[in-house]
Amino acid sequence: MTFEERLEWLKSQHEALITKKNEPVEGNGVYERYADPILTGAHAPLFWRYDLNKDTNPYLMERFEVHAAFNSGAIKWNGKYILVVRVEGADRKSFFAVAESPNGVDNFRFWDRPITMPEYGEPATNVYDMRLTAHEDGWIYGIFCVERKDPSAAPGDLSSAVAAAGVARTKDLVNWERLPDMESSSQQRNVVLHPEFVDGKYALYTRPQDGFIDAGNGGGIGWALVDSMEKVVITDEKIINHRHYHTIKEVKNGEGPHPIKTPQGWLHLAHGVRGCASGLRYVLYMYMTSLEDPSKVIAEPAGFFMAPEGWEYIGDVMNVLFANGWIADEDGKVFIYYASSDTRMHVATSTIDRLVDYCLHTEPDAFTTGETVKRLNRLIDRNHK
């Protein structure tokens, strides 16, 4: 194959991948998954991955491998379904890039350039997992994990790291103003900004933890109020959604995207982590909080809402579903954007009415086998009437 022939082949394959129609798959009544991933490393533009100059790249080989596209924040903006994607290269470094779709389920195309995120303080080794919030103050905020090497690590320890919550804001998703990293007495990941003021303050869902990986004595989804996003300092924090022994969130849990407001309460999507023989298993779960007090949990169905299925189980980090973006349309349709195994992005759709019904009418976890059997028998009895 000549250089020109290979280039035409690459272009045709790339266009076919992007424009392939994505079909829904009938589900459990709560949501419908879609058959194909919406974003992978292969969706990245060819001019990101290849030097297209025959003189400098006569074999037309990849010069910058885009290995994965996952863990994306989401927002409806100018009539388009927008994802701020965690893109990872072969060098393990993540960066943010915007992809947009006209319909939310397929035809996602990356913008021409990745986001150039300004640094704050010591340059970050890695940044990832942005949550987007269009706040009532008029700004779009992005909060993301900032990873740096642990300065107290022992000589030769090249794995220890420190996590902080990076904060940035924008009006156009192109030009970002970097604000100071969040200050907290603990390491923080999975920090999410509530979309409305609460008692005149900005409200944050937090996830305090003792270490970069381990929750230790910390963990759980926290709640904190702050005066300003221009310098976020957490001084008073409470846990509103706890970890619990022998559940899908016994090791860790964390808020996903910002909650969706409904007449019955705030809908929350979160992830829970438990240990198993193959390592850490990440699943998604839901809960609801009160409209009057968004820190008060009013419903939480037992177990997981979504878990890896089929080939979703396979990837760089096996047995993982993670979500940090969803979009609720004005007609009540909800687009749930989730990643599988730190490798690719998917979408599932539902409605606000169905998700509220799921949360309010699915019984909570009673924490023992005996109570689970009672819960099942109650359903059987109702169906036999």
Feature names for model-found ranges:
Residues 1-71, 75-125, 134-192, 196-251, ...:
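Beta-rich carbohydrate-recognition and catalytic domains
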Residues 311-328:
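A conserved acidic, glycine/proline-rich C-terminal tail/linker
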Residues 327-335:
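Well-ordered alpha/beta subsegment
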Residues 131:
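Glycine-rich, Trp-frequent "lid" loop and neighboring beta-strands that shape
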